[in-house]
Amino acid sequence: AYNMIKVAHLADIHIRNLKFHNEYRQVFTRLYEKLAEEKPDVIVVVGDLAHTKTQLSPEYFDMCANFLAGLGNISKTIVTLGNHDGNLRTIHRQDAVTPIVEALDDPNVVLLKKSGEYPLENGIVFNNLSIFDEDNWLDPTDPEKINIALYHGSVSGCQTDAGWPHLSGCQANSPLTGTQQVKGGIRYNKPLLVKKPLCLEG
């Protein structure tokens, strides 16, 4: 018997400082409605909430805080960092997401900033492979559990929708039957039962 959970996988939101905020609100409203209808067990945002990394506006913070609060009102929401959420050359500096999650102080909104394992219920474990903490990437400590890697970057051995190969990045050694590689990540065409590690790409 397989442990089944419903995961809503989001990535690359790219909230800009001032542009497109009316469009974001409209899309976020439709997203909240769809998520409320689908009732996921967990929502995962795999990187790039921000667009401009370090030069951020009050409007960005307001939009991002409202977005995460809206997701947290629907289901447990797990957030990881992407390359647009901070400067990879100065990883000792604060990122664009941590202050928002800390200010929200919502137990339903969790930021996985560092690499490591995040156990859910029913033997399911998210393994965060943070691009800001590559020295601490680890293989699953219990291969008997369902291990799902959270990673913002290219997946080694895959191709873009234009046919270009990804040459480095997360190693996902699970055959992903019923999926196809698309520009924004992995599209699931049918329910997927995972026996080996799976990488959710941002």
Residue ranges with predicted function:
Residues Q55-E201:
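His/Asp/Glu-rich metal-coordinating catalytic cores
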Residues A1-F67, N73:
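N-terminal active-site segment of His-dependent metallophosphoesterases
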